[in-house]
């Protein structure tokens, strides 16, 4: 039985690029075959629980603007929230969803009550998954909202908070496994510090390393087949976060011997906060062998914080999916919309329209990326740029067959005087726009 929240809205269909129907897909046809795979299987779209069904529409200067019938701290409201969530999943035709424990159940008076409520709602959600065929892309624990975590979870100076966080993650991994989740995510929003004056940096990093090692050990002990993912972010809410960016996370994983066990979930907005482009973080993660999944959104170009808006820039999406496809595409990961409505967008239809737009932009970007790969539009010029390294002498230098002295001798003997060559950046940028 329908909740009635979305009125008479029917499942969204593909009508093609010429359609002017605001509630239809113009670029996303889930069954369209691209590079030998259905578009749905390339993109693996997911709707997130937190921004879509939990966020009240507040900002630092004003409170709640959204009035949702499921808002409240009872299990009855939690079940209504799940009812509405799965209605949206079916309207959009998305194959996946994502959640934090605190998104799906109200906080209990104790740890045990919170876990009992999580298990209760997990049974309810499992029945809906069975009925609809919608799957869980990943689960995670909210270790940042409650005041107990104000000084961190794994990095907290109080060992009891560390223990509480560890127990919470165990419960969330258990539920993620029970719901056949394909990944488990850890985001360290409070894992960092505001000032070094009250922070033992080395101790906190070691605590975080031990915590993550326990998570990996537990995954293997219970036979959870999904990937463990860290989501990098440089700041916000914490001033200095330990999972700053992909490079920082990789260094952390190497230090604690976890580089073969943990991958990254990369968010577009977090990449920008770290001073990088989205494609930089994607390409680096792929190069380092730790690419896992993405949170797709965008930040406002003028604001200096994480605005979590729905994506609307096709060239940016094309570059992102270009590097994802070059890395072999998603395996357990997917495209999770970590994006929220603007606080004035009050209508149920706004939730649908926002996701339609995001899904269309991603589809448009991926199809452009696929065409660039097929035509070698970017890889051809790249191969040419580095072609000199195919020469015998160049290969000998790379393989360690030439010492510094031997190279210096050859440079002097051959009177080498290399001339600069154009990087052709503008031509390459024009290619992106042409394919989009």
UniProtKB/Swiss-Prot annotation:
Keywords: Carbohydrate metabolism, Cytoplasm, Isomerase, Magnesium, Metal-binding, Xylose metabolism. Its main location: cytoplasm. Gene3D superfamilies: Divalent-metal-dependent TIM barrel enzymes (3.20.20.150). It is an enzyme of class 5 (isomerase). Binds 2 magnesium ions per subunit. GO terms for molecular function: magnesium ion binding; xylose isomerase activity. Its cofactor is Mg(2+). One of its GO terms (cellular component) is cytoplasm. Mg(2+) 2 binds at residues 267, 270, 306, 308. GO terms for biological process: D-xylose metabolic process. Belongs to the xylose isomerase family. HAMAP family: Xylose_isom_A. Homotetramer. This is Xylose isomerase. It comes from Chelativorans sp. (strain BNC1). The lineage of its organism: Bacteria, Pseudomonadati, Pseudomonadota, Alphaproteobacteria, Hyphomicrobiales.
